[in-house]
């Protein structure tokens, strides 16, 4: 708008009209630029990512290659002091976290309400769904992906929270077949056991989830999801179990985890039918549906292919904010993802060049 101008006649009036028109055009251009800033303007502004991670998680995730690339792209990681109110820190564009506990969740929810402009990865309420193995795979079981380049399901499973001596009878009633994989109810632990016979079931320690073991050629597919990006890594897993194994083995065999990062199977000489990755269209549909249903953007899926089939897959586990540091090229995927979260309207933040955690 033009203020303080005098309305007159003739050339003066036409001149002022022209000035008003120019001012309106300038204002429209400024508004358009504010709504959709050029890439150069975005790159010139620091993207501040506050992180609240355990020391172990911070070390594995914030590797030098991630920090270095992030600095080049204008992304700054700042450690959040859990002993201070979140509102007294920052300001942040994004809060990245993987902490548990009701107190932290409440603090984070209050912060989200006070600062809706900040992206929190991910909402505490959504994360809860993946912390309990009783409900973790429910969303997968409800999907209908039968016509999506393959079939995806979950193994038959049973939640057990009773006296161990009653487990064999509960397994029989549920119609589960041995061997069974026993997993802790709380997903923070990756330890699991393989029980071969009914007697061994009585040696398990509830609460836990029992899952039918599906032969899968000893190869597991770790599907990493970072926003819209999907990356798949092959890992060696538990070998097939045949009838002879069932008759010759007894007891409970404990494993630290199903797969091991050091046992990468991508370069191994494997049977092509075992090593073939799940179809890309199937993974894209599965990831999209789970993102929508779970309300999460950072998680991974452990998938197996039933041995002897080409298109029958099972999801056996899911994890929030998994070990992305083990994913090849994760620093490029993750920094691109963080930049994609920047909102269209940018507010100038103070410099944090001396505050990097």
UniProtKB/Swiss-Prot annotation:
GO terms for molecular function: ATP binding; inositol-1,3,4-trisphosphate 5-kinase activity; inositol-1,3,4-trisphosphate 6-kinase activity; inositol-3,4,5,6-tetrakisphosphate 1-kinase activity; magnesium ion binding. It holds the Pfam family Ins134_P3_kin_N. InterPro entries: Inositol_tetrakis-P_1-kinase (IPR008656), InsP(3)kin_ATP-grasp (IPR040464), ITPK1_N (IPR041429). It comes from the Eukaryota. Mg(2+) 1 binds at residues 302, 317. Induction: By drought stress. Coiled coil: none annotated. One of its GO terms (biological process) is inositol trisphosphate metabolic process. It catalyses: 1D-myo-inositol 3,4,5,6-tetrakisphosphate + ATP = 1D-myo-inositol 1,3,4,5,6-pentakisphosphate + ADP + H(+); 1D-myo-inositol 1,3,4-trisphosphate + ATP = 1D-myo-inositol 1,3,4,5-tetrakisphosphate + ADP + H(+); 1D-myo-inositol 1,3,4-trisphosphate + ATP = 1D-myo-inositol 1,3,4,6-tetrakisphosphate + ADP + H(+). Keywords: ATP-binding, Kinase, Magnesium, Metal-binding, Nucleotide-binding, Transferase. Expressed in roots, leaves, flowers, anthers and embryos. Its EC number is 2.7.1.134, 2.7.1.159. Its cofactor is Mg(2+). ATP binds at residues 133, 183, 211-222, 237, 262. Binds 2 magnesium ions per subunit. Mg(2+) 2 binds at residues 317, 319. Belongs to the ITPK1 family. Kinase that can phosphorylate various inositol polyphosphate such as Ins(3,4,5,6)P4 or Ins(1,3,4)P3 and participates in phytic acid biosynthesis in developing seeds. Phytic acid is the primary storage form of phosphorus in cereal grains and other plant seeds. This is Inositol-tetrakisphosphate 1-kinase 3.
